[in-house]
Structure formats: structure tokens, C-alpha cells
């Protein structure tokens, strides 16, 4: 390995890990972990019919985490990433809420009840993600100058 490659490796590592320290990075990582735990709970139950939601949301969150971590979202400009992330988290919020209510009403088996309760927690987590990534909320307008610009 050349000296220039060795010197650029820490910078590359720093660039790749800097997103994981942000609020959005921690939130995406928490979504992946929570989806994995819900998937395990649904798989441990007698019927794993609801596990597909956890798999799909875990994959979507992991893809977005990789795109944001590697800064690929700035290189692929034909996708509107804030709206994509907002709709992903909004749809996940709605689907986890419906699935959790159905699972808790059925209430067969302790692992399904735990998965339903964790699904409600995932509803809150994805809802918070949708709230902080709402694109229109992030647009800031500069205040109009009130002082004349041509002197006193």
C-alpha cells in the first residue's frame, strides 16, 4: 500500500463514521436494531406472518444508512432524498401502528405480545424520524433587512 493511501485511510474512515454520530445516524441505527429485535420476536412466535414488515423496514433503513454514511446521496441527485426518507418513515409509522394493534388484539403467545409492544415503540421511533425529516420544516427563510443599506 502506498503512503498516500495510508494517509487517506483515516480521513476516509472519519468521513464514513461522522454521519453515525449525528442524530439522524443514531436514529437510523436504532431503527435497524429495533426492526431486527421485532423480527426475532415474530420469528420466535408460532406464526411469522408479520415479520416481512420488519425485514423490509430494516433493509430500507440500512440502505439509507449506507447512502448517508458514504455520502452517496449527494452524488445521486435525481432522487429527492429528504422526501424519500420522509415517506419511508411515514409509511413505516403507519404500518407498524396497524400491525402492532392487530398483533396485540390477537395476543397469541408472549413473543407476539412483546413484538406488538416493540412495534408500538417502533411506531414512535419512525414517527419521530418522519417528524425531524419533514422537508418543508427544514426550509429556512432569511429575514428581510430592516435597516437601509445606503448609509445613515
Swiss-Prot record:
Example of a GO MF term: chemokine binding
GO cellular component: plasma membrane
Record bears the keyword Transferase: no
Residue ranges annotated for the MARVEL domain, each copy included: 19-138
Domain of life: Eukaryota
Function: May play a role in cell differentiation in the intestinal epithelium.
Protein name listed in UniProt: Proteolipid protein 2
Lineage: Eukaryota, Metazoa, Chordata, Craniata, Vertebrata
Gene label: Plp2
Amino acid at each position: 500500500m502506498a503512503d498516500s493511501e495510508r494517509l487517506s485511510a483515516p480521513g476516509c474512515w472519519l468521513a464514513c463514521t461522522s454521519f453515525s454520530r449525528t442524530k439522524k445516524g443514531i436514529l437510523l441505527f436504532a431503527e435497524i436494531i429495533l426492526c431486527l429485535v421485532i423480527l426475532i420476536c415474530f420469528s420466535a412466535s408460532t406464526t411469522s406472518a408479520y415479520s416481512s414488515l420488519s425485514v423490509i423496514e430494516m433493509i430500507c433503513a440500512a440502505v439509507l444508512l449506507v447512502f448517508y454514511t458514504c455520502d452517496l446521496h449527494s452524488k445521486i441527485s435525481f432522487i429527492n432524498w429528504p422526501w424519500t426518507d420522509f415517506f419511508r418513515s411515514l409509511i413505516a409509522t403507519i404500518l407498524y401502528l396497524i400491525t402492532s394493534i392487530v398483533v396485540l388484539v390477537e395476543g397469541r403467545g408472549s413473543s407476539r405480545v412483546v413484538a406488538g409492544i416493540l412495534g408500538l415503540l417502533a411506531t414512535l421511533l419512525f414517527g419521530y424520524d418522519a417528524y425531524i425529516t419533514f422537508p418543508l420544516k427544514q426550509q429556512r427563510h432569511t429575514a428581510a433587512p430592516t435597516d437601509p443599506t445606503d448609509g445613515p
